């Protein structure tokens, strides 16, 4: 079943301009995290435009949502019931245990409280269970798990800027892709689809950012956009295709740091005591749509940079570079899941699309279509073609000093493909609160 999109209405007007600016700012932030070659300096993304040609959408299948979409974030302190009301929370320590009443109800310091019980001259002793536990280095004085993540900005995690309405981002750093991703086993009906993976060794580290309106943080921008509020996950930003598995250090999300050769302190719980993954309850109204998306339009993206020349000495002079992406060809399978006021969105890699829908859809059809039992010749990129124009040097008498430097174009296009595939292809996905 095909879907018609009013592309002009969706991408024009104040809302369309604001969305384009947020996408521009997001891509700009990603380029600031890239290690540039020695001959390129100061990459800036200056503009983004949706163009006038809409994508073609075709619904291929409806099914139950992926299990990953039901997982709650570690920093997410609201459930379905707490979205409407915020009940009083009992004080807990950093491991989730309830704090004893002598500690929770004491208005003063611990020393004042203990001296008030035993008399001013009485010896100060710690309560049972707290003796000889040592002091954890760099331990945070507050339990960040009990603070609403929307209250405090933490701006180092990349995400969609500009305060878009209730947008979230989630990306496991397990490095799974293609035939190694669990999607292939889901399609074959393995135990992965019947229950949640084990927390030890099977749970990948992940990164998540939440974007809410009306905050004091904003991205670098060339336009006046809305503000954004970001929250940081437990992993720092980096190459998501490398595995960054958790080392099993309890309390690492709350500021505690252990050296690799340092034995754990007695206050650290064993790994078997770690809480299980928190999953939302599955309901009958939850659903997921597989939608084939084809695009061959005139979307545009403009970048500027400086090209450094090393003659007669290193970094002797910088030439201005202007690079314009004037269109692209795109063919992939999108996943849209609706789970109780949340919409999860991502694309499938060609291998995953082959396993779940079929080789004709996964490979994009046409001349790239393979026979059902034939091996894939080469992994395909979702961005099939990117049209680019580049200018290096200033115009003099209507002529360019340099044109179409292939090395610079190749580097920029590789980064555009990498950003797209790392941020939008499963197991990375985006979450919208509706």
Curated annotation (Swiss-Prot):
In what ranges is there compositional bias, type Polar residues? 215-237
- One BP annotation, GO: mitochondrion-endoplasmic reticulum membrane tethering
Could you tell me the membrane topology recorded for this protein? Answer: Peripheral membrane protein
Looking at the record, the residues that make up the SMP-LTD domain are: 1-434
Record keywords: Mitochondrion included?
yes
Basic and acidic residues bias located where? 86-97
Please indicate if the UniProt record lists Mitochondrion as a keyword: yes
Tell me, in one coarse class, where this protein mainly resides.
mitochondrion
Q: Give GO cellular component annotations, separated by semicolons.
A: endoplasmic reticulum membrane; ERMES complex
Q: Where in the cell is it found?
A: Mitochondrion outer membrane; Endoplasmic reticulum membrane
Instruction: Give the residue ranges for region: Disordered.
Output: 70-141, 181-277
Listed A to Z, the keywords are: Endoplasmic reticulum, Lipid transport, Lipid-binding, Membrane, Mitochondrion, Mitochondrion outer membrane, Transport
What GO molecular function terms would the record report?
lipid binding
Matching InterPro entries, A to Z? Mdm12, MMM1_dom, SMP_LBD
> From start to end residue, where is composition biased (Acidic residues)?
70-83
Q: How does it assemble?
A: Component of the ER-mitochondria encounter structure (ERMES) or MDM complex, composed of MMM1, MDM10, MDM12 and MDM34. A MMM1 homodimer associates with one molecule of MDM12 on each side in a pairwise head-to-tail manner, and the SMP-LTD domains of MMM1 and MDM12 generate a continuous hydrophobic tunnel for phospholipid trafficking.
Function of the protein: Component of the ERMES/MDM complex, which serves as a molecular tether to connect the endoplasmic reticulum (ER) and mitochondria. Components of this complex are involved in the control of mitochondrial shape and protein biogenesis, and function in nonvesicular lipid trafficking between the ER and mitochondria. MDM12 is required for the interaction of the ER-resident membrane protein MMM1 and the outer mitochondrial membrane-resident beta-barrel protein MDM10.
What is recorded about the protein's domains? Answer: The SMP-LTD domain is a barrel-like domain that can bind various types of glycerophospholipids in its interior and mediate their transfer between two adjacent bilayers.
Q: What is this protein called?
A: Mitochondrial distribution and morphology protein 12
What is this protein's gene name? MDM12
């Amino acid at each position: 079943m095909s879907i018609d999109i009013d592309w002009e209405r969706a991408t024009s007007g104040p809302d369309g301009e604001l969305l384009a600016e947020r996408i521009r700012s997001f891509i700009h932030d990603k380029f600031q995290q890239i290690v540039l070659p020695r001959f390129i300096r100061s990459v800036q993304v200056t503009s983004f435009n949706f163009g006038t040609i809409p994508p073609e959408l075709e619904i291929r299948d409806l099914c139950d949502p992926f299990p990953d979409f039901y997982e709650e974030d570690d920093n997410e302190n609201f459930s379905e019931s707490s979205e409407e009301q915020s009940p009083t929370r009992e004080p807990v320590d950093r491991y989730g245990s309830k704090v004893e009443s002598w500690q929770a109800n004491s208005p003063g310091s611990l020393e004042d409280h203990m001296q008030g019980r035993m008399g001013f001259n009485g010896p100060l002793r710690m309560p049972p269970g707290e003796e000889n536990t040592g002091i954890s280095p760099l331990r945070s004085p507050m339990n960040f798990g009990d603070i609403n993540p929307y209250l405090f900005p933490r701006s180092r995690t990349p995400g969609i800027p500009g305060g878009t309405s209730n947008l979230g981002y989630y990306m496991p750093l397990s490095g799974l892709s293609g035939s190694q991703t669990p999607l292939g086993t889901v399609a074959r009906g393995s135990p992965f689809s019947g229950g949640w993976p084990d927390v030890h060794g099977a749970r990948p580290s992940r990164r998540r950012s939440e974007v809410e309106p009306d905050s004091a943080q904003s991205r670098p921008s060339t336009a006046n956009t809305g503000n954004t509020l970001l929250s940081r996950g437990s992993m720092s930003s980096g190459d998501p295709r490398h595995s960054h598995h958790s080392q099993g250090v309890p309390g690492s999300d709350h500021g505690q740091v252990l050296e690799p050769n340092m034995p754990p302190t007695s206050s650290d719980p064993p790994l078997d005591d770690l809480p299980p993954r928190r999953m939302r309850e599955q309901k009958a109204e939850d659903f997921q749509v597989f939608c084939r998306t084809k695009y061959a339009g005139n979307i545009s993206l403009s970048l500027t940079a400086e090209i450094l020349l090393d003659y007669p000495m290193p970094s002797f002079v910088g030439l201005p570079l202007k690079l314009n992406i004037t269109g692209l060809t795109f063919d992939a399978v999108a996943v849209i899941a609706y789970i109780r006021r949340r919409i999860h969105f991502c694309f499938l890699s060609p291998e995953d699309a082959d396993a779940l829908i079929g080789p004709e859809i996964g490979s994009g059809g046409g001349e790239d279509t393979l026979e059902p039992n034939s091996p894939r010749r080469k992994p395909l990129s979702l961005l099939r073609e990117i049209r680019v124009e580049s200018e290096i040097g200033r115009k003099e008498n209507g002529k360019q000093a340099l044109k179409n430097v292939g090395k610079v174009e190749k580097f920029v296009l590789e980064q555009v493909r990498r950003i797209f595939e790392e941020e939008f292809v499963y197991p990375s996905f985006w979450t919208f609160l509706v």
